[in-house]
Amino acid sequence: MVTRPLVLGAVAYDAKVVTIWEGFRRYFLARDLPFDFVLYSHYERQVEALVGGQIDVAWNSPLAWVRTRRLAPLARAVAMRDTDRDLTSVVVVRADSPVRTPAELAGRAVGTGAVDSPQGTLLPLALLADTPVEVRRFEVGVGLHGDHVGGERDAARALAAGAVEAACMLDANHLLFSKEGTLPPGGTRVVAVTPHFDHCNFSVVADHDALDRFVTLLLAMDYADPATRPLMDLEGLTAWLPGRTDGYDQLEAAVDRFGFYGPAGEVAAAGYRP
């Protein structure tokens, strides 16, 4: 018997987030699962709320997951999207650039996303860590852990304008920016690719009597069902999958290398103010 609603936390990186979680709330309530959600302005606040017991589940960014596990080593990732698995980030140059290898970026300007973006900053810069580059960060949506792609888009614009020699971005965003015209189609070239990594997950710290039911209903969502497909499209997936954690090792190493969080989950990045 569920004694209280399962409360989920999510970060309001875009106005559509309200529509998404209102839709999920209707989905769960229609299946007799008491459910509610709370929105946060940034991930650090959400992680602290999860660890502090103010919410039961957090829809966490990969960086938020890293911090959650440092603050609460027994934390679990219970589910994720099919589109959260096996992503890559790329370092891109203009097609006419003389740069052919990452080492040739030494001494040159490289544009990145916000300081807290795993895919637009931390992971690609870890790839370039042994190359002395001039980092130019485009600080859009700080605290949103890269969910707002504005920083990556601004880095891409700087690349197209010749203001930087290279730009870092999620591989999927490289395709998006070329499609939307931010980058000229065929006008860029990839010079480095990160190993595969995973993105968001539903994180839990403490048990709740409705948690198993929540996961079961989540995994049962069917993209072929016209009632749930629009909601899944908004959240950018075709299937929910069980959570896994081995796709975050690369980010854990980058967090340590750049001192973003301390070993106990304390925020340590210089000048980071979400």
Report the location of each language-model feature.
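Bilobed "Venus flytrap"/periplasmic-binding protein-like clamshell domains
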Residues: P5-R31, Y40, L63, L87-A155, ...
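Generic structural signal for residues in well-ordered beta-strands
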Residues: F35-F37, V135, V190
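Short, hydrophobic alpha-helical packing/hinge segments within bilobed ligand-binding/sensory domains
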Residues: R45-A49, G151-A158, V164
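Acidic, polar ligand-binding/catalytic clefts
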Residues: A49-E104, D116
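Conserved functional loop/turn residues at catalytic and ligand-binding sites
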Residues: Q54, A109, A163
